[in-house]
């Protein structure tokens, strides 16, 4: 007599897991691999510095204010921008120590409203910290942490997967500047000062010592190697300046004055209220477009030639 085969409950469970769980996992893994293979600014910058770090004599650090707002080419063929969107002082400090800059002569670092108070991992853009682990071989976070994968921020993961059918608009120069912010591409109303000032606003300043710790380490690194440190505050539209949190601005200014007293060879160039920049130079209320970036970088180069150790308020 032929026996009929009845699958056990265990084998049935295994099949169900295989049919319903494995396909989504495989799709997730495929998406992860696809995203990691795509070009991005972090991957480009790491590749460039792995090969050419010894050639860099001027290094631009910072957030989107310098990623878009400074044109390295104006500063010379050996200038390079390591700035990235939402990059904090913690990562500026880390990256400065991460690559062996044997011939570095100058570091340019922005001081913005949020600089002393922002901790990337504690904010809504925490997922951006993964770029340092995934694409720049930084070991601040474990490979197996939430910062070791793209999919752990699922909304961002899904947005990046859209590159399958919509090409990315990100672009950058050979020396690391972000190129998307042009006058033609800016959206109206561009002068969103109230919105942007609120985005960068901190009501309490208890994190300032943490930010200053990293700034002091950058200052010490530069001083020990006779590297010129240039702090800059980039131009702001009038609507942005009117919406700034005065106590936050005063706290930042006080800390920067103290820093310069400790590191007197630091140059500070303050362009926040500079009248040299018109509406045509801005992309939004606190970012310059490419034309504005060219103007700002040319002005910085001129200031450094004429008064290399000036704490400038005449740029206002």
Q: Could you tell me what each predicted segment is?
A:
Residues 15-34:
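Hydrophobic membrane-insertion alpha-helices, especially the h-region
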Residues 36-57:
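Alpha-helical transmembrane signal-anchor/signal-peptide segments
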Residues 65-150:
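Membrane-embedded segments
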Residues 284-316:
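Histidine-centered active-site loop/cap adjacent to the catalytic His
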Residues 2, 120-225, 314-316:
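Secreted/periplasmic serine-hydrolase-like ester/acetyl group-modifying domain
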């Amino acid at each position: 007599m032929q026996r009929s085969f009845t699958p056990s409950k265990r084998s049935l469970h295994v099949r169900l897991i295989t049919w319903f769980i494995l396909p989504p996992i495989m799709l997730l893994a495929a998406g992860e691999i696809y995203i990691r293979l795509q070009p991005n600014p972090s991957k480009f910058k790491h590749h460039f510095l792995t090969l050419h770090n010894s050639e860099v004599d001027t290094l631009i650090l910072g957030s989107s204010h310098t990623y878009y707002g400074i044109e390295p080419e104006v500063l010379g063929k050996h200038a390079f921008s390591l700035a990235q969107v939402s990059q904090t002082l913690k990562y500026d400090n880390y990256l400065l120590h991460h690559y062996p800059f044997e011939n570095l002569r100058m570091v340019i670092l922005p001081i913005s409203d949020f600089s002393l108070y922002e901790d990337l991992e504690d904010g809504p853009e925490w997922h951006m910290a993964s770029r340092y682990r995934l694409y720049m071989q930084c070991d601040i976070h474990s490979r197996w942490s939430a910062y070791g994968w793209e999919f752990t921020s699922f909304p961002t993961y899904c947005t990046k997967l859209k590159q399958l059918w919509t090409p990315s608009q990100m672009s950058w120069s050979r020396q690391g500047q972000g190129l998307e912010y042009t006058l033609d591409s800016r959206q109206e109303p561009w002068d969103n000062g109230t919105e942007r000032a609120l985005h960068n606003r901190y009501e309490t300043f208890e994190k300032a010592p943490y930010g200053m710790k990293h700034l002091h380490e950058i200052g010490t690194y530069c001083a020990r190697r006779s590297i010129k440190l240039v702090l800059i505050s980039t131009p702001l539209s009038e609507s942005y300046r009117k919406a700034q949190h005065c106590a936050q601005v005063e706290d930042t200014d006080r800390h920067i004055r103290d820093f310069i007293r400790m590191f007197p060879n630091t140059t500070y160039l303050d362009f926040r209220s500079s009248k040299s920049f018109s509406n045509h130079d801005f992309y939004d209320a606190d970012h310059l477009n490419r034309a504005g970036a060219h103007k700002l970088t040319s002005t910085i180069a001129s200031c450094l030639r004429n008064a290399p150790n000036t704490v400038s308020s005449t740029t206002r």
